[in-house]
């Protein structure tokens, strides 16, 4: 399901964080993220969307390409420009490598950037973004499918600890 609690604040760009693909299709978690991003983008048709996610060895396309294909197929009337960040393999890299695209588009880190991810992932993604210098993050949280919610939150708990130990962010910023 899609979070109906979509902020009305205008972002300069929308970063959609990848979350796995299966045989060239977005996972249920990723579909929810893309649907949430599309609902926001429909309100602001000129802002840049950045799809983030690299390629696994067993997939022919990067996550970013699959995400773009899903948006074009599911939301054909959406006219937002889309850029692909297709090298990343982690949340930290999603955000880091997207900065290159933002700079190319003359979008600074002080500008409002919407980061679309899952509800369980939002706090850590926001902390990593702040640590990397993003100064104005608008969190767009997609709901997690009921049948995988427990496992997702449990995995995120350990990722939160790991990220802190690896200095991907500070707990007290």
Question: Predicted segment positions?
Answer:
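A structural signal for short, hydrophobic/glycine-enriched beta-strand patches
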Residues: 1-154
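A transmembrane-helix-recognition feature enriched in membrane-embedded lipid enzymes
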Residues: 153-172
């Amino acid at each position: 399901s899609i979070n109906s609690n979509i902020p009305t604040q205008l972002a300069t760009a929308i970063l959609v964080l990848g979350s796995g693909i299966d045989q060239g299709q977005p996972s249920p978690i990723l579909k929810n993220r893309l649907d949430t991003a599309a609902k926001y983008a429909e309100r602001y048709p000129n802002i840049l969307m950045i799809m983030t996610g690299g390629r696994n060895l067993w997939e022919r396309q990067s996550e970013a390409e699959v995400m773009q294909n899903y948006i074009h197929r599911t939301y054909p009337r959406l006219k937002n420009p889309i850029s692909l960040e297709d090298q990343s393999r982690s949340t930290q890299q999603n955000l880091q490598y997207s900065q290159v695209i933002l700079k190319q588009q003359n979008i600074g880190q002080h500008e409002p950037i919407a980061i679309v991810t899952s509800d369980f992932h939002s706090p850590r993604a926001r902390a990593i973004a702040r640590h990397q210098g993003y100064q104005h993050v608008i969190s767009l949280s997609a709901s997690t499918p009921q049948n995988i919610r427990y496992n997702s939150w449990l995995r995120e708990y350990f990722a939160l600890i790991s990220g802190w130990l690896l200095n991907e962010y500070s707990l007290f910023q």
